[in-house]
Regions:
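Extended intrinsically disordered, low-complexity coil regions enriched in Ser, Thr, Gly, Ala
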Residues: 71-97, 131-144, 185-207, 255-275, ...
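Internal, hydrophobic cores of structured domains that mediate oligomerization or house catalytic pockets
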Residues: 85-197
């Protein structure tokens, strides 16, 4: 049954409140909640949100950015609430009715910067390529984006595949964002010889300094987690100077994920390295308590709610270590 916009907004508020309870709002999320709520309401499409991500920086002022994601199953032919869609109504309707590739769409809002009027829009590719890449970028209204994306994708090294792609029209140069998942064999080869990663980064067009790569990649590759890489392709077709390197945790029950944050756990070990690099303060410990996996009654049905860290991103820019962020995925599902 399709929920009203008020019902969806109330569910979002519950997901956020559970994560931010017991003082965690001040430590992790700051004062962004009202603007994030507004961004969520602008995003409402389809028959229900699949999940949201709270993108939480691990140093500096407490704040967060918001991602609102929709699986294909959530997008119907009459998909939009009045006034919602953040200007991407035609893109979402085309995707729901005409495009058979990809596994869903998502908005991304720079809430922490106070900027929600021009959100990014991404398509989750994940081994199901779009049939009409050109139409996606045309409806995303960024000139030349399809050409930039294709040129980058044609240079992907062995063992890489596009996980998601999209555009950030509100950022300087309206970059095309491409996230690449590295298969386990290639990832382990990087762990054995970091020069292979340096070679592959150069071959895909990343030309900026790699001075901080040994520290950042070394920390990630010493962990057991998967590896993703994020790139921005700029207006002139060049790959931008910022590189994202992410440890992908996968999805596990909250109790199991918490154990990874305990002393000796794989995430705790990784975060110890990140702390040594100066990219996080003690707030990362609060992420352990922000996660949950619970059920609750909601009228005549039962909801399962969860909030779990799905990956950690480390960024470098012009060769220098820049920052670290946790991405907390949260969702509510009806049971039975």
């Amino acid at each position: 049954m399709r929920k009203s916009s008020d019902e969806l907004a109330a569910l979002y508020d519950t997901l956020y409140a559970l994560a931010a309870d017991d003082g965690r709002e001040q430590v992790l999320f700051g004062t962004c909640a009202p603007l994030a709520h507004e961004a969520f309401e602008r995003s409402l499409v389809g028959d229900g949100v699949s999940y949201v991500w709270f993108e939480v920086p691990l140093a500096g002022d407490a704040r967060f950015d918001l991602h609102v994601a929709y699986s294909r199953e959530c997008l119907g032919s009459e998909s939009f609430f009045p006034g919602a869609g953040s200007g991407y109504d035609e893109l979402f309707q085309w995707y729901a009715q005409n495009e058979t590739g990809g596994q869903g769409l998502a908005f991304a809002y720079d809430v922490g910067e106070g900027a929600i009027d021009e959100p990014a829009v991404h398509v989750n590719v994940n081994q199901v390529p779009l049939v009409d890449v050109g139409r996606f970028f045309e409806l995303a209204s960024v000139d030349g984006a399809a050409t930039r994306y294709r040129a980058f994708a044609d240079r992907l090294p062995h063992g890489w595949r596009v996980w998601y792609m999209g555009v950030h029209p509100g950022r300087p140069g309206a970059p095309v964002r491409v996230d690449c998942f590295v298969d386990r064999k290639r990832r382990d080869a990087y762990a054995d010889d970091l020069r292979l990663l340096e070679h592959d980064l150069r071959s895909c067009g990343f030309a900026a300094s790699l001075e901080a790569l040994p520290e950042l990649a070394g920390a990630l590759l010493a962990s057991p987690f998967g590896l993703e890489l994020q790139f921005d392709v700029l207006e002139d077709g060049q790959v931008g100077p910022t590189l994202g390197l992410s440890a992908a945790f996968g999805m596990s029950p909250a109790t199991q994920m918490r154990s990874l944050f305990d002393t000796g756990g794989a995430i705790a070990e990784l975060m110890g390295h990140v702390e040594e690099l100066g990219l996080t303060d003690a707030r990362w410990h609060s992420v352990r308590d922000a996660m949950y996996s619970i059920t609750m009654a909601a009228g005549d049905h039962v909801l399962a709610l969860y909030c779990l860290p799905t990956f950690l991103k480390l960024r470098m820019r012009e060769g220098h270590a820049l920052d670290a962020k946790f991405y907390l995925q949260a969702a509510a599902r009806e049971l039975g």
